[in-house]
């Protein structure tokens, strides 16, 4: 029911308002003297629609749905241009998780860690997508003020929600800046006070980090209490989670040890209790995952009202091919694209006995670790991502499929929205990661005991193995998954994050934090060779897109790249 409320808000209001009105904001100048799109703000629904656009900008691609030809990003392939799909290309493809052999739009450059400032369109589109989301949030903050609401006669209707609307827009903006900090380092800063003719100042990575941190702390009082907002919108816990993730990476990003803070905020997420671990890992990635209380920050999808070749539609269809639907219910029929397979390093992170797909046990109920969701049963399928001549190949059977994303409900039925597009909400933040953040922070020196860290890790592993309190009838639970204190170290945490969070847009960040992205660990096709080889350290950051320098000639490029 909650899910339907937000979807009605997003897709109904956006459909009515933004197709006709919000596009004006993309083409007309925004300044303090001329209220473009003024008709948007004449009703309370208009304001709700602008906030909805802030949210949906991270999962949808345009105004019409599907690949309707009215995408948000001018010149971008609409199917590619969803934030979630773009982030897969930047955060998963260059790592030890997945292979996608396509050469279009710079994907091969991302896979091989051989990009530059102009040879990978997906890098430019990611940069633009994040700034577009920031622009939507800035627009909301300009217009959702007490004085403007009163001047439009809307204060009585919206005054009680004004503070929370603003806080949510500031959260989304802070999240976008945190990702720009992660991906690009020193980037231009714009806010609601930046004029249309102003040339944005390029801030240092620390300035961007400090801004996002200060915003997340400042909005705490105005965000909804944990668990009280409608499904799909954020509350205080989302801000705590994002702070914990930022603090975990602070030493890498800005040279500051903030592990105590990472632990503090991760424990706030865990101990609050409104977002408990799901009892079954596999349910987090299904079409009815709006029932899953573990998801703190879902990016809402709907097979009818949020159609796109991006979003989780990509995560289902790109990861399967047509014949796989004959072996298990993919939820998309024979519509699989056959693009993405697992690298050998991801497969090897799991016990070999758990990797094999059993056609008589398609959910993997008899596996020890239920996270080992691979397709190994196609004819002539092999683990290696290369052919018999050691060449990269687009043949889908060279490499195992990864099948944790399924467009079906928990009872294995197709969702009511059908099987043409995915109805899986993307779990951008979920509580299991907070457990792993807490454990890692302790191992890096935060004020906690190793026994405490071990408890966090074993809680995750017991859930994965469905042992102890997670045991269910008919599902294997005789192996606990628990490890000992002697087994727990940072290398184990990195591997456990791979097992738990593969495909969830954090792997590049993890490898960099552990010092194993450019060197220290190799994988299939890193630097363009079969077994991988080291690359230069400047690949820890993506380049500022070359197209940005024509409008901002004083912009400084990241080291190792040219303008």
Predicted features along the sequence, with ranges:
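Short coil/turn linking the two alpha-helices of tandem helical-hairpin repeats
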Residues: 181-182, 188, 249-256, 444-447
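Long, intrinsically disordered, low-complexity segments
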Residues: 20-22, 79-80, 86, 90, ...
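C-terminal substrate/ligand-recognition segments
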Residues: 124, 370-462
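An aromatic- and glycine-enriched ligand-binding surface/loop that stacks and positions planar moieties
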Residues: 22-103, 107, 209, 217-218, ...
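Conserved, well-structured interaction surfaces
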Residues: 43-44, 48-52, 56-62, 94-183, ...
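Bacterial Sec-dependent N-terminal signal peptides
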Residues: 1-31
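Structural register within alpha-helical repeat arrays
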Residues: 166, 173, 243, 250, ...
């Amino acid at each position: 029911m909650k899910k339907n409320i937000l979807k009605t808000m997003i897709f109904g209001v956006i459909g009515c308002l933004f197709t006709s009105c919000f596009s004006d904001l993309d083409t007309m100048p925004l300044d303090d003297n001329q209220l473009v799109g003024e008709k948007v703000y004449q009703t309370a629904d208009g304001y709700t629609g602008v906030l909805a656009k802030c949210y949906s900008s991270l999962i949808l691609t345009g105004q019409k749905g599907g690949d309707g030809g009215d995408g948000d990003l001018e010149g971008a392939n609409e199917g590619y241009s969803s934030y979630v799909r773009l982030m897969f290309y930047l955060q998963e493809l260059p790592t030890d998780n997945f292979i996608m052999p396509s050469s279009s739009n710079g994907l091969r450059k991302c896979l091989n860690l051989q990009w530059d400032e102009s040879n990978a369109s997906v890098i430019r589109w990611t940069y633009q997508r994040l700034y577009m989301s920031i622009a939507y949030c800035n627009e909301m903050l300009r217009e959702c003020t007490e004085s403007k609401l009163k001047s439009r006669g809307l204060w009585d209707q919206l005054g009680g929600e004004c503070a929370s609307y603003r806080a949510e827009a500031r959260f989304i903006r802070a999240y976008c800046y945190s990702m720009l900090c992660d991906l690009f380092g020193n980037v231009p800063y714009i806010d609601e006070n930046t004029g249309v003719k102003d040339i944005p100042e390029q801030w240092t990575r620390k300035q961007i980090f400090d801004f996002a941190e200060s915003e997340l702390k400042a909005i705490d009082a105005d965000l909804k209490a944990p668990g009280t907002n409608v499904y799909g919108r954020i509350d205080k816990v989302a801000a705590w989670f994002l702070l914990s993730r930022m603090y975990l990476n602070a030493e890498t990003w800005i040279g500051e040890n903030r592990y105590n803070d990472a632990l503090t905020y991760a424990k706030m997420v865990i101990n609050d209790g409104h977002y408990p671990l799901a009892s079954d890992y596999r349910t987090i990635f299904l079409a009815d995952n709006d029932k899953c209380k573990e998801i703190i920050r879902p990016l809402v999808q709907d097979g009818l009202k949020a159609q796109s070749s991006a979003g989780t539609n990509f995560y289902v269809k790109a990861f399967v091919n047509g014949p796989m639907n004959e072996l298990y219910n993919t939820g998309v029929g024979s519509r699989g694209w056959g693009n993405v397979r697992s690298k050998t390093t991801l497969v090897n992170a799991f016990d070999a006995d758990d990797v094999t797909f059993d056609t008589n046990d398609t959910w993997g109920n008899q596996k020890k670790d239920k996270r080992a969701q691979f397709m190994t049963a196609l004819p002539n399928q092999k683990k290696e991502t290369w052919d018999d001549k050691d060449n990269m190949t687009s043949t889908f059977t060279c490499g195992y499929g990864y099948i944790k994303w399924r467009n079906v409900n928990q009872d294995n039925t197709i969702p009511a929205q059908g099987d043409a597009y995915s109805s899986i909400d993307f779990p951008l933040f979920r509580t299991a990661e907070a457990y792993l953040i807490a454990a890692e922070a302790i191992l890096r020196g935060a004020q906690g005991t190793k026994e405490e860290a071990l408890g966090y890790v074993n809680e995750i592993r017991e859930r994965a193995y469905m042992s102890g309190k997670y045991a269910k009838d008919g599902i294997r639970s005789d192996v606990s998954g628990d490890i000992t204190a002697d087994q727990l170290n940072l290398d184990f945490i990195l591997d456990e994050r791979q097992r738990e969070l593969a495909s969830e847009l954090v792997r590049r960040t993890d490898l960099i934090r552990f010092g194993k992205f450019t060197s220290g660990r190799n994988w299939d096709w890193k630097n363009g060779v079969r077994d991988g080889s080291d690359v230069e350290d400047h690949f820890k950051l993506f380049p500022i897109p070359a197209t940005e320098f024509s409008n901002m000639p004083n912009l400084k490029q990241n080291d190792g790249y040219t303008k």
